[in-house]
Amino acid sequence: MANIKSQKKRIRQNEKARLRNKAVKSSLKTAIRKFREAAEAGNVEEAIILQRAAARQLDKAVSKGVIHKNQAANRKSAIAKRLHQLQQSQAA
């Protein structure tokens, strides 16, 4: 345990940030999992809605500094690609 007052405060702040980041990452995983499940089930309409929601949550996580913008871009690209494949398979 730190003896310096400012370090004690940093420990408290870091713990709060860790819990906040953990909650945001957990909700991101849930949003992406829901999209993936809808896509695997072949439900295009629901997948479109869930893809938008997941992309929105990824952007919010970037603005809060929870994840890097490139990681969010890669994840958004992957789910957009998956949605496009689903739409193409439904159209064919």
Curated annotation (Swiss-Prot):
Belongs to the bacterial ribosomal protein bS20 family. GO terms for molecular function: small ribosomal subunit rRNA binding; structural constituent of ribosome. GO terms for biological process: translation. GO terms for cellular component: cytosol; small ribosomal subunit. It holds the Pfam family Ribosomal_S20p. InterPro entries: Ribosomal_bS20, Ribosomal_bS20_sf. Residues 1-22 are annotated as: Disordered. Binds directly to 16S ribosomal RNA. Keywords: Ribonucleoprotein, Ribosomal protein, RNA-binding, rRNA-binding. This is Small ribosomal subunit protein bS20. Residues 1-11 have a biased composition (Basic residues).
